[in-house]
Amino acid sequence: ISAFVDMMNEKLAELGCQESHFENPSGLNGDNQYVSAYDMALIAQAAFQNETFVTIDSSLYYDLPPTRLNPDGFRVYPGHRMLKKNTPQYYAGVIGGKTGYTMLAGNTLVTCAEKNGMKLITVILNGHQTHYTDTKALLDFGFANFQSVNIADADSTYSSVSNDMTIAGLPAADLSVLHMQKDCYVTLPKT
């Protein structure tokens, strides 16, 4: 198990997570296990780029095969209520996410939703029975006030940089022209 936890922490570093550390694979509380909302959003962003993950996470139920104890099989329902049309928490456009609860952490909810081609990720930590309403409020605000813009729509060359400009500590000589992929989107406030 410790080797797997080491891999989890290596992945945190690879994703740019700086305020999180795992000491067990379950996500349950530990003396040296902690996570920030920002880091959870980075983890979710990476997860929701994986099509297999999205297929599994957006499923409304899983049918487990028959066993000796359950000869008819067993149906398991994931806990994210915003996916389920028959619940008051349903939210059109939710792709998936992760629910959680411990006495120490309270209710936690990570959610990915898409509307008009823009994906948003929300993270609620230490919620107190308001994690779904807080998530809805964040999604409503995000979709109402922001838009996803293709910044490379007109040209693949976005900008030239002058000799005295630096980006993230790199001298301009290393960045004479910035190029964008065709599908390079940025989320901006609506005007």
Predicted segments, located by residue:
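Short, charged, amphipathic alpha-helices and their helix-cap/turn boundaries
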Residues: 2-20
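Domain-terminus/edge residues, biased toward the C-terminal soluble/receptor-binding domains
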Residues: 17-21, 31-34, 38-191
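Diglycine-centered glycine-rich loop/turn motifs
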Residues: 24-25
